[in-house]
Amino acid sequence: MKRPCGHIKNANENTKPNTPEGCEECLKTGDEWVHLRLCLECGHVGCCDNSKNKHATKHFHATEHPVIKSFEPGESWKWCYVDEVFGQ
């Protein structure tokens, strides 16, 4: 049986977004995104893997911050890059 993901369990639910208006990098370059993801470690807002720039995943590779949360209205799921699991 697989152990529960400790990263999601210990993620900070109260992390505030650095750029609530959109993807931090895309806003600087004028690019568009499909969906947004919030890093629960530092508040970075990045675009999803369906977006051409995939800034949320690039942020994980650069920082090793393990957990993102959907930054879409009405969605509350989380993803752990380390354990590759979804959580609530």
Question: What role is predicted for each listed range?
Answer:
Residues 3-22, 29, 45-88:
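Cys/His-rich, Zn2+-coordinating zinc-finger modules
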Residues 23-26, 39:
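Short cysteine-rich clusters marking metal-coordination/redox-active sites
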Residues 31-40:
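Canonical RING-type zinc finger of E3 ubiquitin-protein ligases
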